Swiss-Prot record:
It comes from Xenopus laevis (African clawed frog). Keywords: Apoptosis, Coiled coil, Developmental protein, Disulfide bond, Lipid transport, Mitochondrion, Transport. The record marks 27, 41 as: Important for interaction with prelid3a. This is TP53-regulated inhibitor of apoptosis 1-B. The lineage of its organism: Eukaryota, Metazoa, Chordata, Craniata, Vertebrata. The keyword Transport applies. Disulfide bonds join 8-47, 18-37. One of its GO terms (molecular function) is phosphatidic acid transfer activity.
Length: 78
């Protein structure tokens, strides 16, 4: 799947490969220490945020789940 911004697609693929490799080779084998893909994700996220802004895609009112939100907090249920 391509990214929302064409200029971000290569970064997305690079991050996806990094994450999938880390998940399969480390995390699933019990090594949850560190995520070597953090910097790739940060750069990809910045690219996507810029693309959303440049394309004037409205995101107001959209709830995003982040590391500090559980699904029930994000969707308003308990």
């Amino acid at each position: 799947m391509n990214s929302v911004g064409e200029e971000c697609t290569d970064m997305k693929r690079e991050y996806d490969q990094c994450f999938n490799r880390w998940f399969a080779e480390k995390f699933l084998k019990g090594d949850g220490s560190g995520d070597p893909c953090t910097e790739l994700f940060r750069r990809y996220r910045e690219c996507v945020q810029k693309a959303i802004k440049d394309k004037d895609i409205p995101v107001d009112g959209v709830d995003f789940m982040g590391p500090s939100k559980s699904k029930t907090e994000a969707d308003g249920s308990s």
